[in-house]
Swiss-Prot record:
The keyword tRNA processing does not apply. GO terms for cellular component: cytosol. The gene is glgA. GO terms for biological process: glycogen biosynthetic process. This is Glycogen synthase. InterPro entries: Glyco_trans_1, GS/SS, Starch_synth_cat_dom. The lineage of its organism: Bacteria, Pseudomonadati, Myxococcota, Myxococcia, Myxococcales. One of its GO terms (molecular function) is alpha-1,4-glucan glucosyltransferase (ADP-glucose donor) activity.
Amino acid sequence: MEILFVASEVAPWSKTGGLGDVAGALPRALAARGHAVSVVTPRYGTIDPHAHRLRPLHRALDVRGEPTTLWVSRDRAPVYFVEHEHFFGSRRGLYGEAHDYGDNAERFAYLARAALALPGALGLRPHIVHLNDWQTGLVPFLLRREHARDAALAGARTVFTIHNLAYQGVFSKHVVPALGLPWDVFRYEAMEFHDQLNFLKAGLVFADALTTVSPTYAREIATPQGGVGLDALLRHRARDLHGILNGIDVEEWDPATDRHLPARYSAADLSGKAACKSALQRELGLPERPDVPLVAMIGRLAEQKGLDLVVAALGELLARDLQLVLLGTGRPELEEAFRRAARERPDRMAARIGFDEGLAHRMEAGADLFLMPSRFEPCGLNQMYSLRYGTIPVVRAVGGLEDTVEDFDGWSRGTGFKFRDYHPQAMLLAVRRALEAHRDRRAWRAMMLRGMALDFSWDRSAQAYEALYRSLAAP
């Protein structure tokens, strides 16, 4: 099949979160399965065409009478970078710097039209146009309204993926004329949302199929508690909504080959994991104790990630015989709470405020447990990294965490520990269960091996998307 994939960020060229990872990995996995995949994204000012060996295309796109030039990557799934100096090239950020850019509606309406102009200019004939998050939400409507007679897009079906429903691209209704949209889109059945224009809602209303990044998150967003104001629409489209779990880069995240680790290991030989633990304790200034459970946390210090639960429980956590290590940045009050705990209990706590890719790998390898108490989690990556590295996750049973971690039954089943209530005591109970299980080395090793045997590759995800694409393209 021929697939056009449109995203506002694509790793490794541009990334602010999980969307960039998906847009960088899924098209390649689909191409490896024999599909012809092209990706469209902006050429932001942070992307140096020469450093990335991008090739200029001497064919201009006509976007509402304005010529647009392109760059293309040298990939099996080529990435086409849309050039626009004012909207993209002159900006240091993707969506904003201290605050969102005031013209984000115009910027991403431009991306939507450029993406739809590209097939005709390059001789592509996509069967599927796959959109991602609010930045591409106008594409399904524009395909129907402005490209209904476009031979290059004849019969193309649209898939719209929600990576995080909390980010919706909501703008003043006064931008409608500036975007070249007709006023009939500004109604409840289309893009109107509390007297504003909602780009994400546009995608949900007009796309042929909807997906999100885990089966449980697909169910959660169709409830009043998880729907962020769009649950009724998602229930209305329940037959078209599919939860497909993200994958991870199993080459980058492989303890047998990981270049960031002081010692490598595998399910066949776990001895290197103990060496990684000792090295991590030394690196972070903790007492070097092979017997003590080492608990890691990595990620944004934000309310979504449940770090307020950890702060509330820090006293009880650090009263136990364990070591807690944290890597991340975010809300200043959370940063200070972890810094203060590390100062007060340097034998039990280490906090690194910031981000360090190598240290993230070493923490996944050196820890015994990974704590992820998210308030909500569309998919989550770190629990999958942890399972692959033989590090047992302790998670709140939401979104992708529910789908990827099986609760330990106390004997022979399970890959981690789960709790449901969003409360410090519920989290502490799960941690206590994990610490008790850690004392049984035989059962613990068996749990590690069960997790390490799971398949979280992008090929598994690509197969699920492939099945959805085929169902849409079938006559």
